[in-house]
Regions:
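Active-site neighborhoods of metal-dependent hydrolases
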Residues: 41-201, 205, 271, 278-284
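Acidic, glycine-enriched loop/beta-strand segments at the rims
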Residues: 190, 208-213, 222-258
Length: 404
């Protein structure tokens, strides 16, 4: 609550995840402007919400003691009781508190659906995967989701998802502000496409098509206090528009039937949009430079890999995925197998390619430290902090090195 008090003093709104140690009502009264992912909402919607809250505190302490983390209540033994004691009356009471305090809800159904249906082969074979980098999709397999969830976990999450839909529909009817969010970069939240998925889930929850559209347009404008400039199509407002071939008020799925986009005064007709999608698909299909270089390191050594990278960048500058993540992932992979000198050379390439990224210097510093080169480790941690004064890891490691 100290954060809430300080935010009030300096006039900064705060929002985010509901902490497990705070009730939904208390967070709302303290001024939390929005809740993300409906965290804590279903337990608060139980006729035994107080008992569940207290039991969760005990479980929270035990999980921290034994595992160093706490999975949400929906993953605990209290989950079934939470669903069995769901109370529409409690939802009405919660909604009244939220409406009175101006507390919004951002369900991110696209994310919640992934947790519930991540084991569904249809989801895994979604054709939109072709627009995603392979290194991102690699972590989307059910065995990789949320700590290797069991079939029982997925079965429970499916029941929970249906209840989440019901809760949001009830809150909308009660006048609670709803925001369309997607938490993009999580599994199966496809860039751009996921907002259309979210609109569909909002309608499934009971919102009308116009209410779902407002959750993605007018409501965010109001939430940020920008409704004088954004949120509706009116004279004098910013004219960033999506032009459709069919009416979304008849069927929310019609938001996908895009004819053109107007953005910052530029018109992008369907052929231009299709060309953009084709480019994204081509970029996503590029070979990963990390995988290419690792093979060379294994077969010929780090010097050959560095030479190979420079040749590829000269002769085929756009044909490989040379994102920062590729260098960082490869470098830490080399650290993992204790090839510290190799990691240093890879992180040097990362610094060369991304000189304004604090993380490249932070990673290079770690490799130097692991290799026993304290002075160069300090120098690079200092550079990372120079770029990002809030780099907590760099600050901590620099303090540790300077004390040795």
């Amino acid at each position: 609550f100290d954060i809430a008090d300080e935010a009030k003093k300096i006039g900064i709104p705060f929002e985010g995840h509901l902490p497990v140690t705070v009730t939904a009502e208390d967070a709302s009264r303290a001024g939390q402007k929005s809740f993300e992912h409906l965290i804590g909402i279903l337990p608060a919607s139980s006729s035994r919400s107080e008992e569940l809250f207290q039991a969760a505190q005990v479980e929270f302490a035990e999980e921290l003691r034994t595992h160093g983390r706490f999975d949400e209540l929906h993953d605990s033994k209290l989950g079934e009781e939470m669903l069995d004691t769901y109370s529409p009356r409690r939802v009405e009471e919660l909604s009244a508190v939220f409406k009175s305090n101006g507390t919004w809800q951002c369900p991110t159904f696209t994310l919640l659906h992934m947790f519930a249906y991540g084991d569904d082969p249809a989801l895994q074979s979604d054709p939109r995967v072709k627009y995603m980098p392979p290194r991102v999709v690699a972590g989307w397999h059910p065995d990789e989701l949320d700590g290797k969830r069991s079939p029982q976990d997925f079965a429970f999450a499916k029941k929970e998802f249906q209840r989440d839909l019901e809760v949001v529909g009830a809150m909308q009817k009660a006048g609670v502000g709803i925001l369309a969010g997607t938490d993009t970069q999580n599994p199966y939240t496809f860039y751009g496409f996921s907002l259309h998925d979210e609109l569909g889930f909002l309608v499934q929850a009971g919102l009308s098509p116009i209410e779902a559209l407002q959750a993605a347009t007018l409501n965010p404008a109001r939430f940020f206090g920008k409704d004088k400039d954004l949120g509706t199509i009116e004279k004098g407002k910013l004219a960033d528009l999506v032009l459709l071939d069919a009416n979304p008020l008849d069927d929310i799925a019609n938001t996908r039937k895009i004819n053109a986009v107007v953005y910052r005064g530029n018109l992008y007709a369907r052929p231009a949009l299709d060309a953009m999608l084709a480019k994204v698909q081509a970029l996503a299909a590029r070979p990963l430079i990390g995988k290419v270089l690792f093979k060379t390191i294994q077969e010929q050594g780090i010097d050959a890999a560095v030479t190979q990278y420079r040749e590829l960048k000269t002769k085929h500058p756009d044909d490989y995925d040379c994102s920062e993540d590729e260098f960082i992932g490869l470098g830490y992979g080399l650290i993992h197998i204790k090839n510290f000198k190799g990691a240093i050379e890879i992180f040097k390439l990362a610094v060369e390619a991304y000189p304004q990224s604090y993380n490249t210097y932070d990673s290079l510093a770690e490799a130097y430290m692991d290799n026993g080169d304290k002075d160069l480790a300090i120098r690079n941690y200092q550079k990372s902090i120079e770029i990002n004064p809030g780099n907590a890891n760099g600050i901590a490691m620099l303090k540790k090195l300077n004390s040795q």
